[in-house]
């Protein structure tokens, strides 16, 4: 929904603040000065990151100078989205925008000493969370371009750890997670990655252990300029 401020036919009425030419056109009742208080430190405002998924929202963000955040899709599906943003931003700014610029990717992450331990400690919790998310979305966002899933009685019958893990999870050993992140860097020229380990139901100590392993064993081995990396917290 979109709103107009002030509303049509607005008339300023305030006992403690009478109409003034300083902020109001007293003939038309048009407010000339209206702003957010307190104002942002950065001018005109901090960089804005818009959550996007469909082509229309991706293009709109690029055309209006907004950065974007993406989450669930597979690498192949993300490639198309990254290209849509790059092409729209290049046209809007009249320059060759490199793939990956202005995009941040969110990935669910859980690092453990073994692949089996990662699944045991966090697998059930990420699936339960995804059942809640996908109750509304279905599984379409998890599919590769052109992929067709077999028909099932219920729309989430295929949703299990094996289905999810290969598509978009950074779950496993430090070495596995490093390789998956480097794949994102190689295929998408990924420049911004956000990770999340605190899924509903997960043990707090396990979550903190995952984050520590990510900071200590994953970040130092990612093929990124270390000056651009902030540790997970």
Where are these regions (language model features)?
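Short glycine/threonine-rich loop-to-helix capping motif typified by GTGT followed
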Residues: 111-115, 203-213
């Amino acid at each position: 929904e979109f709103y107009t401020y002030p509303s049509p036919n607005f008339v300023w009425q305030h006992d403690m603040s009478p109409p003034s030419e300083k902020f109001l056109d007293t003939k038309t009742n048009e407010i000339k000065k209206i702003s957010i208080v307190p104002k942002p430190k950065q001018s005109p405002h901090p960089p804005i990151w818009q959550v996007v998924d469909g082509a229309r929202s991706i293009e709109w963000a690029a055309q209006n100078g907004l950065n974007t955040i993406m989450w669930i899709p597979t690498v192949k599906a993300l490639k198309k989205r990254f290209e849509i943003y790059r092409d729209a931003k290049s046209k809007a700014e009249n320059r060759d925008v490199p793939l990956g610029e202005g995009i941040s990717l969110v990935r669910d992450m859980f690092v453990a000493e073994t692949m089996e331990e990662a699944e045991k400690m966090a697998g059930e919790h990420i699936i339960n969370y995804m059942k809640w998310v996908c109750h509304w979305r279905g599984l379409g966002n998890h599919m590769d371009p052109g992929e067709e899933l077999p028909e099932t009685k219920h729309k989430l019958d295929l949703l299990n750890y094996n289905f999810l893990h290969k598509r978009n999870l950074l779950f496993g050993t430090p070495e596995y997670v490093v390789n998956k992140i480097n794949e994102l860097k190689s295929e998408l020229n990924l420049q911004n990655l956000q990770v999340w380990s605190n899924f509903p139901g997960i043990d707090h100590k396990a979550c903190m252990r995952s984050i520590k392993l990510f900071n200590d064993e994953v970040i130092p081995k990612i093929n990124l300029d270390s000056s651009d990396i902030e540790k997970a917290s």
